[in-house]
């Protein structure tokens, strides 16, 4: 029916808005990069919870499980393939990894659903990393975790049925479509900056003289001269600058990237980049194919 298509279109538009909010506001506030006032950043950080993701767990996983250990096997949470993917040369290879470059995009689309229904609870109640086991979760954060999930699922699934009178099947289908889009978009924004065929996977934290060299070796930019991509990705296509200056708002990344690139060339430090996001995705899939077919 026409009304159903209108509902689905508006529902998908809402999902697109959630993606922009996550990449442009929530991520920056998580790094205290939006305002010099901590209360402002903390308040905006709850955008994660409004979108069904625990801001508390994201902060722990993203800061301790990524920024402090980029591309380190067994430490960087972004490299956790749960046996489905092989993201580093140091992970054991399984027969199905030969096809990971084929099924990757489909499973990446499940990323958002995984975070909403499983990942946050798994990290909170059944921690696997040492930094998660050492975390002393307060009762308040536990309450916010459940309240955020409940609020999100209520306005996304329950209210359209009860208030708008839409069929549960239609709402569930629209919900699935939204998360397939959000999951694929967010995953590709991040995966194309670290896990590509030209980045490096250190064996330990002390492999480089300082953290700056570590960042340059393990991180790559893409489409840095394309303002539209920068706007859509919340500046995360300028990923080297993001890791060098995580407390700087992404609206400053473009000019800073030009300075960083020039300085890297001046001191002979390799600067990795791709002119387009499409090429970055291609090189990510090349790495997956390489890791799936050889040790």
Language-model regions, residue ranges each:
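Alpha-helical bilayer-embedded segments of polytopic membrane proteins, i.e.
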Residues: 1-22, 49-53, 101-113, 137-189
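Short low-complexity stretches enriched in small and charged residues
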Residues: 3, 61-65, 144-147, 197-199
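Membrane-embedded catalytic scaffold of the fatty acid hydroxylase/desaturase
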Residues: 13-137, 205-294
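Juxtamembrane transmembrane-helix termini
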Residues: 121, 125, 162-165, 196
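Composition- and surface-driven signal marking solvent-exposed, interaction-prone regions
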Residues: 121-122, 169-177, 186-193, 202-204, ...
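Extended hydrophobic/aromatic segments used for targeting, binding, or gating
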Residues: 161, 177-208, 288-291
């Amino acid at each position: 029916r026409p009304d159903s298509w209108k509902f689905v279109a508006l529902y998908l538009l809402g999902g697109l808005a959630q993606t922009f909010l996550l990449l442009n506001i929530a991520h920056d506030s998580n790094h205290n990069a939006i305002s010099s006032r901590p209360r402002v950043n903390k308040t905006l950080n709850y955008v994660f919870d409004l979108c069904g993701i625990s801001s508390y767990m994201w902060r722990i996983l993203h800061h301790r499980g990524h920024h402090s250990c980029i591309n380190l096997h067994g430490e960087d949470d972004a490299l956790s393939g749960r046996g489905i993917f092989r993201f580093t040369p140091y992970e054991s290879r399984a027969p199905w990894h030969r096809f990971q470059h084929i099924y990757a995009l489909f499973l990446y689309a499940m990323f958002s659903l995984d975070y909403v229904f499983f990942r946050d609870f798994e990290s909170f109640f059944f921690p696997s990393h040492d930094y998660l086991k050492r975390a002393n979760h307060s009762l308040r954060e536990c309450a916010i975790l459940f309240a955020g999930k409940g609020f999100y699922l209520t306005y996304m699934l329950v209210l359209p049925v009860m208030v708008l009178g839409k069929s549960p099947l239609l709402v569930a289908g629209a919900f699935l479509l939204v998360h397939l889009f959000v999951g694929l978009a967010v995953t590709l924004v991040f995966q194309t900056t670290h896990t590509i065929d030209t980045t490096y996977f250190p064996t330990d934290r002390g492999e480089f003289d300082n953290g700056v060299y570590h960042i340059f070796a393990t991180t790559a930019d893409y489409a840095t001269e394309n303002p539209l991509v920068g706007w859509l990705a919340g500046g995360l296509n300028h990923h080297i600058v993001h890791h060098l200056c995580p407390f700087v708002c992404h609206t400053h990344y473009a000019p800073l990237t030009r300075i960083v690139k020039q300085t890297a060339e001046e001191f002979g430090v390799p600067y990795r980049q791709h002119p387009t996001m499409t090429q970055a995705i291609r090189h990510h899939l090349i790495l997956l194919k390489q890791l799936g077919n050889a040790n």
